From Swiss-Prot:
GO terms, molecular function: iron ion binding
Protein name as catalogued: Probable Fe(2+)-trafficking protein
One Pfam family of this chain: Iron_traffic
GO BP of this protein: cellular response to oxidative stress
GO cellular component, one term: cytosol
Organism from which the protein derives: Shewanella baltica (strain OS155 / ATCC BAA-1091)
Record family assignment: Belongs to the Fe(2+)-trafficking protein family.
Lineage: Bacteria, Pseudomonadati, Pseudomonadota, Gammaproteobacteria, Alteromonadales
NCBIfam families (UniProt xref): PRK05408.1
Domain of life, per lineage: Bacteria
Stated role: Could be a mediator in iron transactions between iron acquisition and iron-requiring processes, such as synthesis and/or repair of Fe-S clusters in biosynthetic enzymes.
Keyword set, alphabetical order: Iron
Length: 92
């Protein structure tokens, strides 16, 4: 049976992550409150941020910036702003 969480991002019950993917207290908070679906959405945004802003994950400042963006996206509902990115329109 899949583990479910009350996902803060999606605002609904959904399948939870299989294990803690991020270290520390923030990782525990993500594990307890974020669904697989929401984490997948974040991973897409994270990849775009890393590529567009040319972030270096060996750089402490870049990692801190990415963590701030992740917290804002997952827990505060703030959209990640990526310069020049225009989301595709839904086609009926």
């Amino acid at each position: 049976m899949a583990r479910t969480v009350n996902c803060v991002y999606l605002n609904k019950e959904a399948d939870g992550l299989d294990f803690q993917l991020y270290p520390g207290d923030l990782g525990k908070r993500i594990f307890d409150n974020i669904s697989k679906e929401a984490w997948g959405l974040w991973q897409k945004k994270q990849t775009m941020l890393i590529n567009e802003k040319k972030l270096n994950m060996m750089n402490v400042d870049d990692r801190k910036f990415l963590e701030e963006q992740m917290t804002s996206f997952l827990f505060e509902g703030k959209e990640v702003e990526i310069e020049g990115f225009v989301p595709e329109k839904d086609q009926d």
